[in-house]
Amino acid sequence: MQAIPRSPFHRFLEAHDGLRLHYLDFPQPGAHLPVVCLPGLTRPAEDFEALAAKLNAEGLRVLAFDYRGRGDSQWDADWTHYDLDVEEDDILRVLEQEGVSTAAFVGTSRGGIHTMRLALHRPDLVRAAVLNDIGPEINLAGLIRIKRYVGKLPPIASIKDAIALTRFTAGSDFA
């Protein structure tokens, strides 16, 4: 029997340093193993809405996370807080607030790094993991490409500018 898909709730939590964090909760009464979706470096929780809707319709609860400074989470004026340890603490606070003691994780890029770190630091928490756009070895050329554009993107005034910017950021991956 297929479950009734639920609309997501926008939830907020105060981080250890007082910053307001946002995440999406696609509830599903009676779900046993929640799925936690962790996005890439510059991406929001909304990236997972289609996946969350499908999983939710199958009876799974889904939590999708906005890291600090992304999506609807508050921007942090201290740039040193944009690091894996601080973000991992943020993720754990959300899971604690939601009563999640074990989950399946879907991690894209930086979210995959968080998933692997959580599996190392909290093996009791990670029951299953799906890693997207990341693996145990990180290609240096890819990191250099990302560094070229993160935090440096100009305003986009036209579709021509958007295409040029996509070619620049994606390199040879954009035909």
Spans of model-derived segments:
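Alpha/beta-hydrolase fold catalytic core
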Residues: 1-35, 57-60, 100-101
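Active-site loop/oxyanion-hole signature of alpha/beta-hydrolase fold enzymes
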Residues: 16, 57, 67-106
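Conserved HGGG/HGGXW glycine-rich cap/lid loop of the alpha/beta-hydrolase fold
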Residues: 24-74
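Short, hydrophobic alpha-helix immediately C-terminal to the catalytic nucleophile
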Residues: 49, 92, 116-120
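Conserved hydrolase catalytic core segment
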Residues: 101-140
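Short, glycine-/aromatic-enriched active-site segment of Class I SAM-dependent methyltransferases
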Residues: 140-149
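Acceptor-substrate binding/catalytic loop of class I
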Residues: 148-157
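Conserved alpha/beta-hydrolase catalytic His-Asp/Glu region
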Residues: 157-175
